[in-house]
Amino acid sequence: MKKIDTLANDIYDLLENGTKSPKQEHLFAMASEIVDSMKKQLWTGTTPSKKGKLRMSNIGKPCTRALWYDINGDEKAERLTPQTKLKFIVGDIVESVILYLVKESGHTVTDQQKEVELQGIKGHIDAVIDGELVDVKSSSSYG
């Protein structure tokens, strides 16, 4: 069983040398995740939410006013700009591709997008890789 400390090098090795037999189930899972992301951003992510819930992903917001509006809603909330929606789509795609490469490089991925709850606050974890909880992030040097 592989360990997470070799993960980056194993992915780079896969990218450099390829594989003779990519696992179809990994490819189909990645494609399905990307389709789901597009549906979420294009069809269900087009309007601001009326009223939300306290979630693990928003609990750490430094602005308590923004957190209040996340939970209580704001009829005048700004719609997401096309540029912001594109960032969310790219982030979702990057997560799907990275987790595909993790699997294809021989590492164990479990609990993808598993819902968790702590003291009544719900959230989703990105994945557990080789027994380690991970959060997949994409970033740009441009801010």
Mark where each language-model region is:
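Metal-dependent nuclease catalytic cores that hydrolyze phosphodiester bonds in DNA/RNA
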Residues: 1-133, 139-143
